[in-house]
Amino acid sequence: MRALFLHSNRIKVIARQKALKEADQLEKPEFDVNKEHLAVFVAVEHGDNLSVAEQLVEEIKKVLEKIGIKEKVVVLYPYVHLTNNPSSPKLAKEVLDKAYDLLKSEGFEVYKAPFGWYKEFEIHVKGHPLAELSRTIKPKKVKKEEGNKVYLIYDGEKEYIIVGKKDKILVKDYKEIENKEKLHFELPKDGIELPIPINQDFEKMVLKEVFSEGEEIEKNPLNDVAKKFGFEWEPLSDYGHMRYKPYAALMVDLVNDYSIKIAKELPFPVFIVKGTNMFDLKQGPVAEHAKLFGERMYEVQSDKSVFVLRYAACFQQFAIAKDLTLSYKNVPFGMLEVADSYRFEQPGEVVLAFRLRKFYMPDLHVFTKDLDEAVEQFLNMHKKIMEEIKKIGRDYELLINVASFEDYEKYKYIIEQIYKDVKKPLLLAIYPKSDQRYWIINIEYHIIDVLGRPREIGTTQIDLHNSKRFGIKYIDKDGSEKHVIILHNAILGSIERYIYALFDTALRKEKPVLPFWISPVQVRVIPVSEKYLEYAEQIAKELESKFRVELDDRDETLNKKIKDAESLWVPYIIVIGEKEIKNNKITVRDRYENKVYETSLEDLISKMEELQKGYPFRPLYGPMKLSLKPANL
């Protein structure tokens, strides 16, 4: 908030023309205060909240005391021109009304210039050193009074309340709470007393989600792996922004391609879109949806307005969907954008290639006709998410967030279906009821990384509210208009998090290796010496139309060349020397089988084609010859 305090003898205000729909209702179009008073010109700014009204009143009292005004006469004047970053008119009006009421309650004689009107005014300001003062008032952080979440472990038909040491229940206000069996999680980790078997990964997720155990570890092998493949912090940008060197850029684009491929294989039409990453916070639907992210909003000021940088593709896809003419015949359908996304994570919380302020999200929204269809597709999306993580040899632990206790009772049948699919305990977080939540059920899919920390990768949600907020409707069979129900889905998670999961999976193997399709270098051809370079280049050129192949033509020893290829986890290293040329064979160091063997080039090509089948392909993002590549690129 910006405030200008003017010690005045007189102010006359006349409302001339209504400017805003939120404008005050006028009792009188003008007032004239012809006595000593403090005129307070106020601009409420974006990011303020109602707490600034109380702070404004305190500043008014301080200024009156500082100037030495004995009469408690104050004129409040809304004056947006004090800032280039104004709040919404709704909030500005609420702040001014609250300040007015607070001053009245403390015995002040208060006048308020009408809000939302074009006005003319005359003012006579005194001429002493303290007659004109200004203040910038910062809002206090307002904690949401949501009560406590209820944490349950759901195991088939049974529910177990999670309690901590000394039976301190972490939940309250959950009906029939005493009818639930209790799980005693003793902290610190000195054992868990459980009536049901759970695996270690699930236990770690519970300890992290419920008890906030498990800090980031500075020495993280996953950081070293990410850097090796070219994922780095960009020091010339903001916290949490990365740069992507050629191998990293290639991997990101391959996951981009793969996310589109699997979306197009779903059993309904999926449309690929693109759009902007900035949305106007003065627009009602945008402002309402943005509130859900609070301090994690990434904002940009322009000459037009204050914009929020999107944290997924919701805004753009909903903005497109609201303009469509939809029939029941068009629904269900999906909309996908691999969206550059922004979240204002705290500097100390960012994690290379995982928790970022800017990342890429293959964000898929599915628009359905009704709840039955939404639940059907929700279960399909769940199965697809589980299928994709199993392709890389992993499994997820599930945290299911439920919007309210009422929703838990109403939609428990969905959770039962999820349980029947995964056949293992689920962690449920049941929230107190709130109008702020747009979803009724929100599933987070977690892996546990090599350091024992839960890492959310995929997600799916049922959204009952945004179609009404944005006005997304279809015409039903009977000719009536109905709002769609929306599913939010990240089948792979963000691109960076999916790659993080691939790195984490690779580190668990005897010899770390990535899936063939996403290995930035799939084959490296190494001549034993310069004498065999020409033949090695012929081999490389024969492969490069189908595979990403590099030729190590550097003036280095054979051992050095092999070591460098091994450090990059290259799946197939082909060594070419006198024996290979003479026998018309190649010697292959096979990282998947952890073997060295002789084979024909044709047999190796067949093996690699089988590994590549069903996945996207892109060529190298650099030259084939390593001699042309700068060091550290």
Curated annotation (Swiss-Prot):
Cofactor note: Binds 1 zinc ion per subunit.
Sites where the protein binds Zn(2+): C314, H365, H488
Reactions catalysed: tRNA(Thr) + L-threonine + ATP = L-threonyl-tRNA(Thr) + AMP + diphosphate + H(+)
Cofactor dependence: Zn(2+)
GO biological process: threonyl-tRNA aminoacylation
Enzyme Commission number(s): 6.1.1.3
CDD domains reported for this sequence: ThrRS_anticodon
Major subcellular location class: cytoplasm
Compartments reported by the entry: Cytoplasm
Keywords annotated in UniProt: Aminoacyl-tRNA synthetase, ATP-binding, Cytoplasm, Ligase, Metal-binding, Nucleotide-binding, Protein biosynthesis, RNA-binding, tRNA-binding, Zinc
Signal peptide per UniProt: none
Entry's Gene Ontology cellular component terms: cytoplasm
Pfam families (alphabetical): HGTP_anticodon, tRNA-synt_2b, tRNA-Thr_ED
NCBIfam families: PRK03991.1
Known partners and oligomeric status: Homodimer.
Domain notes: The N-terminal domain is an archaea-specific tRNA-editing domain that hydrolyzes incorrectly charged L-seryl-tRNA(Thr). Catalysis of tRNA editing is performed by the charged tRNA itself.
Protein's name in the database: Threonine--tRNA ligase
Organism annotation: Nanoarchaeum equitans (strain Kin4-M)
Organism classification: Archaea, Nanobdellota, Candidatus Nanoarchaeia, Nanoarchaeales, Nanoarchaeaceae
